[in-house]
Amino acid sequence: MIKQRTLKNVIRATGVGLHTGEKVYLTLRPAAPNSGIKFRRVDLAEPVVIDARPDNVGDTTLSTTLVKGDVRISTVEHLLSAFAGLGIDNAYVDVSAPEVPIMDGSAGPFVFLIQSAGVQEQEAPKQFIRIKRPLQVEDGDKWARFEPHDGFKVTFTIDFDHPVFDKNSQTASIEFSSTSFVKEIARARTFGFMRDIEMLRKNRLALGGSMDNAIVVDKFRVLNEDGLRSGDEFVKHKILDAIGDLYLLGHSLIGSFTGYKSGHGLNNHLLCELLKARDAWEMVSFEDEGYAPISYMRTAPAGR
């Protein structure tokens, strides 16, 4: 039987919020079977728990933000992507601020934290959502689509009219496994344009952004001294984001996702439409690991 997974141990880290610039204390804790991923604001007089679910997404400006009443937890997608990549079904995520720390702008540090905590299999079957028919949402020339597929495949295309993007790949595809996620996707960093930074900061956004946690691009080039980690790092980060956004379903997917210039808002719209279309998906589990179309490593060394 493919079993649900949680963390073996509690693990802690400290970082800064990308948009708030605040110091954030992060704690990842094990959770019981069928708990799902639960985020907790522990800096409030009474801690507030927000389940990682599509209907709890209240804002998708520049990141995916979970909302309950007037309580917010932003930038959840990179950590959710790491949970998805290592097959973690159940965990508590405690944060001391309204944002998950940005770390280095990728999912790599979160993969390292999860591996350091250890992965614990639980005595409950892992539930997958299998896509049964195509489903697409659109916004102008942008679109996102699910299709049936025997595995989990993510394809993404970005389209930036810019010298740096013109000479690097703007389309990428990954056939998902823990190995491919850790090696190919996890270390792709978020990126931003110098021209946008002043406007963002006037709006109290990107206050914690720096070249330590993002790829920064001016009119002509990448400004980071160490350059890109790979020629397709920009589009690979969009795949990383999409994997995190899709994990708000609370289950690993069996199917293909294709995004064309899609972002957090359109990704979430697709999830909400999927959940409404009950003929488009089904829940499945696997008694025999050999029949499962997706493989998860027990441990996967974080790439350097």
From Swiss-Prot:
It comes from Methylococcus capsulatus (strain ATCC 33009 / NCIMB 11132 / Bath). It is an enzyme of class 3 (hydrolase). The keyword RNA-binding does not apply. Its cofactor is Zn(2+). Transmembrane segments: none annotated. One of its GO terms (biological process) is lipid A biosynthetic process. Belongs to the LpxC family. GO terms for molecular function: metal ion binding; UDP-3-O-acyl-N-acetylglucosamine deacetylase activity. Its EC number is 3.5.1.108. Pathway: Glycolipid biosynthesis; lipid IV(A) biosynthesis; lipid IV(A) from (3R)-3-hydroxytetradecanoyl-[acyl-carrier-protein] and UDP-N-acetyl-alpha-D-glucosamine: step 2/6. The active site is at residue 264. Pfam families: LpxC. One of its GO terms (cellular component) is membrane. This is UDP-3-O-acyl-N-acetylglucosamine deacetylase. Zn(2+) binds at residues 78, 237, 241. InterPro entries: Ribosomal_Su5_D2-typ_SF, UDP-acyl_GlcNac_deAcase, UDP-acyl_GlcNac_deAcase_C, UDP-acyl_N-AcGlcN_deAcase_N. It catalyses: a UDP-3-O-[(3R)-3-hydroxyacyl]-N-acetyl-alpha-D-glucosamine + H2O = a UDP-3-O-[(3R)-3-hydroxyacyl]-alpha-D-glucosamine + acetate. Keywords: Hydrolase, Lipid A biosynthesis, Lipid biosynthesis, Lipid metabolism, Metal-binding, Zinc. Catalyzes the hydrolysis of UDP-3-O-myristoyl-N-acetylglucosamine to form UDP-3-O-myristoylglucosamine and acetate, the committed step in lipid A biosynthesis.
